Amino acid sequence: MIYNYPMKYRRQFRRLPKHLQGIYYAFLSISTMIKIALDPYSKRPMKWMHSGTPFQYENERMVMIKLSLATVGLLFATRLSGLQFNKYTELKSVAERQQIGQVNDPQQRKIILDHHGDIVAIDLPAYDLYVHPRMCSISLERIAELLSPILDLSSQYLYNRLDEGDSGICLMHQIDTNTSAQIRRLGVDGIELVHHPQRVYPKRGSFESILGYVDTEGYGQAGLESSLDDWMKSTYQDVPCWMDGHGNFLGIRFPKQILFHQESALQLTIDCGLQEKVSQLITNAMNRFGAKRIAAIIMEAHSGAIRCLATSPSYDPNCYGWFPMERFRCWPITDLFEPGSTFKPVNLAIALENGIFQPTDRILDTGKIRIGDSWIGNVGGGFIWDRSLDHLTGTQILQRSSNVGMVRVMQSLDPAIYHRNLIRLGLGSHRNDNQTSFKMSSHDHNESGWNLKDLTSDYAISVVKDQDEFVDHEIEAATASFGQGLAMTPLKLLQLIATIANGGMAVTPHLISKIVTLDHFHHLQSMNEFSLQGWVGQSVLSRSQYHAKQPRPYTHDLYLGHVPVPSLELGWFDVKSIPPHTRERRRLFSRQTCNVLLGMLEQVVLDAQATGSRGFLPGYAMAGKTGTAQKASALGGYSTDSVVTSFVGIYPAVKPKFVTLVIIDEPEDPFRFGFNTAVDVTQTLISEMIVQEQDPPSYPTVSLFERNM
C-alpha cells in the first residue's frame, strides 16, 4: 500500500488525478523491485520497504523472483506506453464504437414566424406512452391505479387497454414533459416513453387558414404545413450519444445538435397582430349577419405580400379533430365565385384601355335593358336615385353600381376583343404562371394547401366561357360586364384590383417573406437584399459557386431572403423555378387608366349617396367598390335566396399601399347587399390598419353630412 512508502512519495501520489494514481503506484512498485534486485546483499536496512517489520537479507531465490516480476512489469509498461502513443486514435475509435451510439430522434419541423418574427408554429417536446405488460414487475391493476390520476383517465379504462395484449400498447400520444416526468418517477418496469414532438400553434384559430395543421404522425394535412411538408421537416443527421452496456442513452454530454438542430425557419408576410384582430372582427360580423362564412384579405398593392388572410368559421389546429373537415380548406384561394359589381372597375379599365369609353362620356341608364330574350336590370338595394341623372358618367356608374350602364359601355367593344382582354388578365386559365404562387395540396383528401415549388397549378383560379360561346351569345358579354357569368377565386379578384391600385403592374400574391437562417433567429431585422438581375439564363450553380456570388442591391421592393435565389431549400434550383413574385412584372393597364379609375373609386366612398359611403373614414382617403352577386343554383340558373356580398377597398386612395377584400357568403335578410355588410366590415378593418401603420390623416376631417352638399 502507498502508506508503506516515504512521505514524499505519498504526497506526490495524492497530488495526482485519480486516473493516474494507479499508474504511479505500479511504476513505484516496479522501481522498488528493480532496486532490490540490483542490490540484494546491501547491508543498509531498507526499513521503508516493510515499515514495522524487521529487515531480512534477500536470498538468491528471492532475487530471481523479484527480478522476473520486475521484467514482466517493465514489459507491460513498455507495451502500455506503445499502445498509448502509437495506436491512440485507433483504440479510441474502437472504444467509441462500443460506448457511443446514434440517437434516432424524430425529426422536428421547422419553426414558422410571422412578419415581425413572432412564432406562430413550433415543435415542442412530447412523448408517446407505451406499456409492455409482459415486462411489468407489478400487476396491471396496480399500473392502472398509478397512471389514472396522472393521465386523468379512469383506472378501469386503463386496465381494459392494458389487457389488450402482451406488448406495445399505446395508451396516449404526445404527452407533455410534466406528465412524462411524473410517469418516470413511478419507476415501473415495462413503461416506455417514446419521444414524439408535438406541433403547437400559439395563435390557435387565427392562422389556421394559412398554416393548416400537422397530424399525430407528423405529416402536414392542410395549408402551408401540407404544401411544404417535405421542406418543413428538418434534415439533420442522427447524432452520437453516450450509451451504457445495454444500449440505453446515459444522458451525459447531451449534444447540441439535438437541442439546436434547426437550420432555418420560415418567415411569413402575415402580420400577427392584424391577423388576430381581423379574425375576431369577421367572426363577430358572421354572427351579426347570419352568414354561412366570411373571409377578409389584406394585401400590399405593389408587392403582392399578403398581410392578412382570415376566414370564419375557423378551427383550432391544436385540436383539429374536433372540427368538420370542410373548415380545413382555405376557400378564399380555392373556391370560385361570381364577383358581381366588384368586377366593374376591371371592365371599365378594359374599356378605357381600348378607347371605347372616356371618363367624361355619358351613358343612358333606363333602369333595365333587353339582351336577346333576357332582361337585365339594376338592383337598387334601397337607394333612391335622382331620376334626372339618367345619363351617367363612369363615376356615377360606379357610384350607383349600374348594371345597365356597364352593359351599354361594354356593348361598344367587340366581344372577341373583350374576351381576349379577359384572357390577357389571366382569367379562364388553369395555369397560374406569373399570377399566383398558391397551389392545392396533392393529397387525395379535400384539404388544401399551397406549393411554392411547382408554379403551375391543376385547379382553376378563374372560369370564363370559351371564345365561341362568348362571341355567339350576346348575353355572355352582357352579364360579364357586371361580374356575372364568369367566376374566379377571391384572391384572383383582389390581384386584379391590386393591379389598378399600383398603376397597372401585375403582382403575385404570396405568403412567404424569407427563409431565416439559424444565425438570424434572434436578429431578424437586418436581412440582406440581393438582385436577380444577371442570373436569368444561367445554368444551375453548385453550392460553393452559389455562396461565392457577391451580393448586389435587390431591385424590387421585396424581402426574399439572404441569398439571390430565395431558397435552395425549397427546391428553386434554376431560373424557371424562381418564385413568380421575383420575376419581371408585366404591365396590364396604363398608369393613366389606373389614375382615372382610382379617382372614380374614391368618389364611391366620398359621395354620401353612393353604395360605398358607409366605408368613409373622416380625414382618410379611401377608394372601393361594393358587390352583390347571385349564387348559381344546383338546379340551373341563379338562386333567388342566396347571394354573395363583397367589397374591395384601396387604401389610401392616393398612392395606395394596401388593397382589401371582404367577402360574405349567404348573409340573411336584411343584410343582402354589399353596402350594408361588407362595407361596414371593411371600414373597421381599414381603421385597424391605420392604427397599425400609424398613418396621419390625408385630408381635414369633415362630417358625413357635409360631403357633396
From Swiss-Prot:
It holds the Pfam family PBP_dimer. The keyword Membrane applies. InterPro entries: Bact_Transpept/Beta-Lactamase, Beta-lactam/transpept-like, PBP_dimer, PBP_dimer_sf, PCN-bd_Tpept. It is a single-pass membrane protein. SUPFAM superfamilies: beta-lactamase/transpeptidase-like, Penicillin binding protein dimerisation domain. Signal peptide: none annotated. It comes from Nephroselmis olivacea (Green alga). Belongs to the transpeptidase family. The gene is ftsI. The presence of this gene in the chloroplast genome suggests there may be an unsuspected vestigal peptidoglycan layer in this organism's chloroplasts. The chain crosses the membrane at residues 20-42. Keywords: Carboxypeptidase, Cell shape, Chloroplast, Hydrolase, Membrane, Peptidoglycan synthesis, Plastid, Protease, Transmembrane, Transmembrane helix. The active site is at S341 (acyl-ester intermediate). This is Peptidoglycan D,D-transpeptidase FtsI homolog.
